[in-house]
Amino acid sequence: QQTESRFIFKNIITPEDKFTFTICNPPFHSSQDEATKSTVRKINNLESRSAGSKVIKPILNFGGHNAELWCEGGELGFVTQMIYESAKYPMQCLWFTTLVSKKENLSSLYKTLSKVNAVEIKTIDMAQGQKTSRIVAWTFLSEAQQKAWKF
């Protein structure tokens, strides 16, 4: 468990650790207010499709506790920090991966991955119903190092 909330991998990945991959479902929102408005919008959309009524106060949080739904900087800030931290463990993890909900964040994330010298970057698009998101994966290992990877 992370003991310092401002970090993602520090104190979690130790010098003797080796991981085939990490996976992250980052906080999407940058504030409690933004998370609440998003929840209200989702509930209203669901209600308008089924019963035609409007819900004013959110009852559900759509799959997370408050601390999991938002953080300062939102999805872009969280994943950017994750990328910078991942660069401190280049030989300890074959692939770092994260969900990216907001397509407009991709350009900035790709620039950050370039800054930290990620060797390979992959984006996997996903769609379910009207929701489109993607998984972004990166590695600091060369093709030869990837093939030689042993867990």
Predicted regions mapped to residue ranges:
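Class I S-adenosyl-L-methionine
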Residues: 102-151
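Conserved nucleotide-binding/hydrolysis micro-motifs of P-loop NTPases
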Residues: 5-6, 27-30, 103, 142-144
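Glycine-rich, charged/polar anion/phosphate-binding loops
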Residues: 5-10, 82, 122-123
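Conserved Class I SAM-dependent methyltransferase catalytic core
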Residues: 58-122
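Mobile active-site "lid"/loop adjacent to the S-adenosyl-L-methionine
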Residues: 20, 26-77
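S-adenosyl-L-methionine
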Residues: 1-24, 31-32
